[in-house]
């Protein structure tokens, strides 16, 4: 478990009856949410010990870039269930545009990770915590 257990951030307001609504969301919409969830998680991990805002920002940006997210996905893949891998696949296939500096394959992998994180945020906060706890962030506060 992470230091953020029982924090409202990870407590989705959706109940099991909302499952069809979540299933109907596009992978792009889930990736949009997953991007925000992941960045907020990384920001929380680097919040302590206190740092200058520029150092804080550099550390966070280094972790939320497509290249790093693709590497994180590679690390997590062996731990994913088949349904989770399906969300990653859907996210990869839905990635439509890339930044000029990003390799398209890396961008697709990052989109797959973000899609999965967005889905888990809405449907399974405990599993989201489990997967986030597996991510090693350099120089982050102990979790």
Swiss-Prot record:
GO MF term list: ribonuclease III activity; rRNA binding
GO CC, alphabetical: cytoplasm
Main subcellular localisation: cytoplasm
EC number(s) per entry: 3.1.26.-
Subcellular location: Cytoplasm
Disulfide pattern: none
Top-level lineage group: Bacteria
TM spans (from-to): none
PANTHER family tied to this protein: MINI-RIBONUCLEASE 3
Function: Involved in correct processing of both the 5' and 3' ends of 23S rRNA precursor. Processes 30S rRNA precursor transcript even in absence of ribonuclease 3 (Rnc); Rnc processes 30S rRNA into smaller rRNA precursors.
Protein name: Mini-ribonuclease 3
Organism: Synechocystis sp. (strain ATCC 27184 / PCC 6803 / Kazusa)
């Amino acid at each position: 478990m992470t230091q953020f257990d029982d924090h409202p951030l990870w407590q989705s307001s959706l109940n099991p009856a909302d499952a069809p609504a979540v299933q109907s969301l596009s992978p792009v919409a889930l990736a949009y949410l997953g991007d925000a969830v992941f960045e907020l998680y990384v920001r929380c991990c680097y919040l302590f010990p206190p740092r200058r805002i520029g150092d804080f920002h550099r550390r966070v940006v280094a972790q939320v870039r497509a290249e790093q997210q693709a590497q994180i996905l590679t690390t997590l893949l062996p731990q994913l269930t088949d349904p989770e891998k399906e969300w990653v696949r859907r996210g990869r296939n839905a990635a439509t545009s890339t930044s000029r500096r990003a390799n398209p394959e890396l961008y697709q992998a990052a989109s797959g990770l973000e899609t999965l994180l967005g889905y888990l945020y809405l449907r399974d906060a405990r599993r989201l915590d489990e997967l986030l706890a597996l991510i090693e962030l350099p120089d982050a506060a102990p979790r």
